[in-house]
From Swiss-Prot:
The lineage of its organism: Eukaryota, Fungi, Dikarya, Basidiomycota, Agaricomycotina. The modification Cysteine methyl ester is found at C482. Belongs to the SKT5 family. Activator of the chitin synthase CHS3 which polymerizes chitin, a structural polymer of the fungal cell wall. Chitin produced by CHS3 is deacetylated to chitosan, which helps to maintain cell wall integrity, anchor melanin, and offers an advantage during infection, as chitosan is less readily detected by host immunosurveillance. GO terms for molecular function: enzyme activator activity. Residues 476-485 have a biased composition (Basic and acidic residues). Residues 483-485 form a propeptide. This is Chitin synthase regulator 2. It comes from the Eukaryota. Disulfide bonds: none annotated. A lipid is attached at C482 (S-farnesyl cysteine). One of its GO terms (biological process) is chitin biosynthetic process. It is a lipid-anchor.
Length: 485
């Protein structure tokens, strides 16, 4: 029986935790030892220096002003750098000693996977792009390569002995540029390993082999083979494979005729087994129940909202963004609730969903009594984040903020750069602003916007006073009248 919007609304008062991806989300289980698996460590090269001190970042310090503040900041709950009982280099050494001592293939596989995950975390992404690395960073990079080399060497030996999890994990490494020349994706090496693991019935490998056949990664494109692998993965209840079969049936892709009824069946099966990695079917079913398909899917906003909530709980940014809109504007039968709207927008924005970032800009411009304090600085920072993600209307907004001094010191020259980016992205207001070249109109618009913000704050406060509750009124009512949104 479908949950009502009222029930969803009550349940949603509990905060939804931000999803934390596991270090190794693709491995379901360790391989079963085989009869010839006792010499995996034979002929391995001598142990390497695998000290990985500083592998994990410690506590965040004070927030850099160039980044928007997280709305639900729980950084004070994080452990410090000394929270680990053992240093990571010591952990790797103990792992290695145990693996050598027992020569247990399962333990060796776990050790290899641990080393790969450790290597991934050794260097922050921003330092990866450093064109002039320091000697310390160069040493850390060399150490990381040594760890990856040892791990992939062990995985190769396990894969050669027929361990499907090792075959899949190594293929996944190659597909993501780990253990390859210059860190480039190597599907020519990955695809055969996906095939080997798929022959053992490995669901993830079947799915990945299907994607390779569909897109021609490491092989020629072959829709029939792709469907065959997807169906084999679906037998293993792989949600991604079931979702792809569903969308193919819905849209008439991969050689299927357009069969909405069959497509919906696959989507429902996928939704029943949705995970953080594959929540897509929940979102797609929600959209279908929002608009309906004649004689196939009936319109049911309550059920659609329930599906979106389930998907958002799994951390799917598009679902969280859509729920943010629903609770902002009262769509799909959801009550207007600024707190829930901001909450869901935040979940989405933390995953770099550009429209969600810009939605938070709008909320910060006007604030919400008892929920979110008004802040021009935060409005600017969220707009800047959305602009950097390529949203044209956010680029225009940043130009406007920069020109008129909202949340940042006024700088007309810097504003022109943002206007140009917005115009190139198709924003007509930016093109018009560049054509007129007049700053007076922008200043007039700022005065008008300040008056609009004050009007909204007063209106929201009056409504809250009449209703006896500060959470039932949106300080963002009439946002469409805002001159920059």
């Amino acid at each position: 029986m479908a949950t009502t919007n009222a029930q969803i609304y009550q349940q949603s008062q509990m905060p939804i935790p931000m999803p934390t991806p596991s270090l190794n989300p693709n491995i379901n289980s360790a391989p079963t030892p085989g009869p010839n698996a006792m010499s995996v460590y034979e002929d391995c090269q001598s142990p390497l220096d695998t000290s990985v001190s500083g592998m994990y970042p410690g506590d965040r310090g004070s927030r850099v002003v160039s980044q928007p503040a997280p709305l639900l900041d729980q950084s004070h709950l994080r452990p410090g750098n000394q929270a680990n009982l053992l240093s990571h280099d010591r952990t790797i050494e103990l792992y290695r000693e145990n693996a050598k001592k027992t020569n247990d293939p399962e333990l060796i596989f776990e050790f290899s996977a641990f080393m790969i995950d450790a290597a991934k975390a050794m260097i922050p992404p921003e330092q990866e792009k450093d064109t002039n690395p320091s000697p310390a960073l160069i040493k850390q990079m060399e150490k990381r390569e040594e760890i990856i080399k040892e791990a992939t060497s062990l995985l190769k030996r396990l894969a050669d002995r027929g361990f499907p999890d090792a075959q899949y994990f190594l293929a996944d490494c190659y597909a993501n540029g780990i253990g390859t020349a210059r860190g480039k994706q190597d599907f020519d090496r990955a695809f055969p390993l996906f095939i080997l693991a798929a022959k053992h019935g490995h669901p993830d490998a079947c799915y990945r082999a299907g994607t390779c056949c569909e897109h021609g990664w490491g092989c020629r494109r072959d829709s029939a083979k792709a469907v065959s692998f997807y169906k084999k993965a679906a037998v293993g209840l792989h949600p991604g494979a079931m979702y792809r079969l569903g969308t193919a049936e819905l849209n008439g892709a991969l050689g299927f005729p357009r069969r909405p009824k069959e497509g919906v069946k696959w989507l429902k099966r996928s939704a029943e087994h949705a995970t953080e990695e594959f929540p897509h079917a929940l979102h797609e079913l929600a959209l279908l129940h929002e608009r309906g398909i004649e004689n196939v899917v009936f319109v049911d906003n309550d059920y659609a909202a329930e599906l979106l909530a389930q998907s958002a709980e799994l951390g799917y940014a598009p679902s969280a963004f859509k729920l943010g809109e629903c609770y902002e504007y009262g769509k799909m039968g959801c009550p207007v609730d600024p707190a829930l709207s901001i909450h869901y927008y935040n979940i989405s924005a933390q995953q770099d969903h550009k429209d969600a970032c810009f939605a938070l800009t709008a909320w910060y411009l006007v604030g919400s009594p008892g929920v979110l304090p008004q802040s021009d600085t935060e409005a600017y920072l969220w707009a800047k984040k959305a602009a950097e993600l390529g949203l044209a209307k956010a680029q225009y907004a940043v130009g406007y903020f920069t020109e008129t001094g909202i949340g940042i010191e006024a700088n007309p020259q810097a504003a022109l750069t943002w206007y140009k980016q917005a115009a190139e992205g198709g924003d007509k207001r930016a093109a018009k602003r560049l054509a007129t070249g007049s700053r007076s109109s922008a200043l007039d618009r700022r005065l008008e916007m300040e008056a609009l913000k004050e009007e909204k704050r007063l209106g929201a406060a009056n409504l809250a006073q009449r209703s006896g509750s500060g959470s039932g009124a949106s300080g963002k009512d009439g946002k469409d009248g805002c001159l920059i949104m």
